[in-house]
From Swiss-Prot:
Stated name of the protein: Crossover junction endodeoxyribonuclease rusA
Record's catalysed reaction(s): Endonucleolytic cleavage at a junction such as a reciprocal single-stranded crossover between two homologous DNA duplexes (Holliday junction)
Gene Ontology MF terms: endonuclease activity; magnesium ion binding
Cofactors (names): Mg(2+)
Chain sites annotated for binding Mg(2+): D85, D87, D106
Example GO biological process: DNA repair
Job description of the protein: Endonuclease that resolves Holliday junction intermediates. Promotes DNA repair. Exhibits sequence and structure-selective cleavage of four-way DNA junctions, where it introduces symmetrical nicks in two strands of the same polarity, though it can also cut branched DNA structures that lack the symmetry of Holliday junctions.
Protein family per UniProt: Belongs to the RusA family.
E.C. number(s) listed in UniProt: 3.1.21.10
One of the Pfam families matching this protein, by short name: RusA
Cofactor note: Binds 1 Mg(2+) ion per subunit.
Source superkingdom: Viruses
Length: 131
């Protein structure tokens, strides 16, 4: 079974590292800084959710490409080497996909392919394939 889709976003997702930490009454509290809620990412993942979850214990390949909008046309399709870190973006995305039941558990992913590229528009391409 193979499931693939893509969607555009006004703002690209943020990572946990971009969230804030403050000390209140001697205890650390984590909070969402303005713009770190990822509502549009969650909404798009809910909208594109597969009808059936991939079965438990089925090994999966997850391929994701994050396209970041930039104005300089000559830099489109070049690698994005600046922040956010790709591994943090992927962990965030995989957590949402697990919660939304794209697959039973993210331990099913045995093959992970991820890329960050500059492009004309902010968008994400996702492909999940049984291995």
């Amino acid at each position: 079974m193979k499931f693939e889709f893509e969607f555009e976003l006004d703002k690209m997702p943020t990572t946990q590292q971009q969230k804030g930490i403050k000390k209140v009454k001697g205890k650390l509290q984590f909070y969402d800084r303005r713009g770190t809620n990822n509502y549009s990412l969650k909404a798009q993942l809910m909208k594109n959710k597969p009808k059936e979850c991939f079965e438990k214990n089925v090994p999966l390949k997850l391929s994701v490409t994050f396209f970041y909008a930039i104005k300089q046309k000559k830099r489109w399709w070049q690698w994005k080497t600046s922040r956010p870190d790709l591994d943090n973006l992927m962990k965030n995305l995989q957590d949402y996909m697990t919660k939304l039941r794209y697959y039973s558990d993210d331990s099913q992913i045995v093959w992970l392919e991820a890329k960050k590229v500059n492009d004309e528009k902010n968008r994400i391409e996702i492909e999940i394939t049984e291995v």
